[in-house]
Amino acid sequence: MKIQLIAVGTKMPDWVTKGFEEYQRRFPKDMPFELIEIPAGKRGKNADIKRILEQEGKAMLSACQKSRIITLDIPGKPWTTEQLAQQLEAWKHDGRNVALLIGGPEGLSPECKAATEQSWSLSPLTLPHPLVRIIVAESLYRAWSLSTNHPYHRE
């Protein structure tokens, strides 16, 4: 199973790239973790936000191919590390790849929300989207380590 993190935004600060890559490199070869960056639409005072969301959504969904789509969204379901480890195991048994979607400044398009099979909430807080990349990478790595009895996760 391959996991794709599909996120709006391409020019991240170095600390985001380094933080994400630190966890990305730890994933096992049988569960590669890939970042796909979708260019953000141009935003300005006269920007058509609905059209921008639609374009970003189309690009995100086309990157998903036939993967199980999971959106990162505040109203989604919060998972403990143990629950995320169980989700990871269920996704593996499903036989499809997994695409996790992180929207841009205005969130996810209605099309992305309609296509999702699950919605995951990291927090009731609004988090900066660059930071979410690192939190998701670490959380997935921790869940994997729990399910494989790797010493990274400690009770």
Swiss-Prot record:
Positions contributing to S-adenosyl-L-methionine binding: L72, G103, L122, S123, P124, L125, T126, L127
Pfam families: SPOUT_MTase
KW S-adenosyl-L-methionine (keyword) present: yes
Record's catalysed reaction(s): pseudouridine(1915) in 23S rRNA + S-adenosyl-L-methionine = N(3)-methylpseudouridine(1915) in 23S rRNA + S-adenosyl-L-homocysteine + H(+)
Entry GO CC: cytoplasm
Gene Ontology molecular-function annotations: rRNA (pseudouridine-N3-)-methyltransferase activity
Keyword Transferase: yes
EC number: 2.1.1.177
Record localization: Cytoplasm
Endpoints of the signal sequence: none
Keywords: Cytoplasm, Methyltransferase, rRNA processing, S-adenosyl-L-methionine, Transferase
UniProt xrefs under Gene3D superfamilies: 3.40.1280.10
Known partners and oligomeric status: Homodimer.
Family: Belongs to the RNA methyltransferase RlmH family.
Function: Specifically methylates the pseudouridine at position 1915 (m3Psi1915) in 23S rRNA.
NCBIfam families listed in its UniProt record: PRK00103.1-1, PRK00103.1-4, tRNA_RlmH_YbeA
Protein name: Ribosomal RNA large subunit methyltransferase H
Organism of this sequence: Histophilus somni (strain 129Pt)
Gene that specifies this protein: rlmH
